Amino acid sequence: MAATLRELRGRIRSAGSIKKITKAQELIATSRIGRAQARLDSARPYAFQITAMLTTLAAEAALDHPLLVERPEPKRAGVLVVSSDRGLCGAYNASIFRRAEELFSLLREQGKTPVLYSVGRKALNYYTFRNWDISGSWTGFSEQPQYENAAEIAETLVESFMRGTGGEDEGESDAESVDELHIVYTEFKSMLSQSAVAHRIAPMVVEYVEEPPEVRTLYSFEPDATTLFESLLPRYLTTRVYAALLESAASELASRQRAMKSATDNADDLIKALTLMANRERQAQITQEISEIVGGANALADAR
């Protein structure tokens, strides 16, 4: 009985220690999520406008650029998987990997070989353990990504894409080249809602928007459409990657805050249950000791 009581008290202390850790992680995530949301809200309008501008520019000027043209018989598709550097964020990474696997299966059905790029230590460890060849990986900034991080990633992806040869024989193709670029990340909708999504970022999908004749917009390009497009294109790709990193950072913190709050609440419930069990055990122990004392006293009285 004494051993059981000691075990219960030890479990209570362990649960209390874990609760302190989870509560601290919850408070840290809560304090950071506001800044992450503010950065995301600031970046979204710019990402939307530059995408709309390039789409309009490509449609109006009928540009023929490698990042706009679908390649015949594409064979290799680059996929950037954005995960977290740390755990303790619930099903955040599992959802990303599941969505990435769905994309890999779809690409293989289309006759394309996935070429993997990863952001975050969790993705690096996950795919390394499964013997994937990782063409590029970046770690250390999943919670607080900077524009420079996105620029470095975008530069690597664009270099691989521009080396792509499309329909040539696979043996003649550059081992580092890709014909498409996709990105898998977690889209932040609210503190309670995030979802893993996959988008193709190259070749760009040019959408032609029909305007009524009375509001038809006339565009003038200075110095010319091609030069303007060439200068904006690197910013577009970097912005798309940066927006995905910010979406993922906000989603990671929101997932961690929820997971740690749930863990803290569970620790509270466990401590209450263990405390009740310990109190009952202690009460039974005291009752037994009293019974033994009374029994001993009665035995002495009878002996007289």
UniProtKB/Swiss-Prot annotation:
PROSITE patterns: ATPASE_GAMMA (PS00153). It comes from the Bacteria. It is a peripheral membrane protein. The keyword Cell membrane applies. GO terms for biological process: proton motive force-driven plasma membrane ATP synthesis. GO terms for molecular function: ATP binding; proton-transporting ATP synthase activity, rotational mechanism. Keywords: ATP synthesis, Cell membrane, CF(1), Hydrogen ion transport, Ion transport, Membrane, Transport. Pfam families: ATP-synt. InterPro entries: ATP_synth_F1_ATPase_gsu, ATP_synth_F1_gsu, ATP_synth_F1_gsu_CS. It is found in: Cell membrane. GO terms for cellular component: plasma membrane; proton-transporting ATP synthase complex. The keyword Ion transport applies. Produces ATP from ADP in the presence of a proton gradient across the membrane. The gamma chain is believed to be important in regulating ATPase activity and the flow of protons through the CF(0) complex. HAMAP family: ATP_synth_gamma_bact. F-type ATPases have 2 components, CF(1) - the catalytic core - and CF(0) - the membrane proton channel. CF(1) has five subunits: alpha(3), beta(3), gamma(1), delta(1), epsilon(1). CF(0) has three main subunits: a, b and c. Belongs to the ATPase gamma chain family. This is ATP synthase gamma chain. It comes from Mycolicibacterium paratuberculosis (strain ATCC BAA-968 / K-10) (Mycobacterium paratuberculosis).
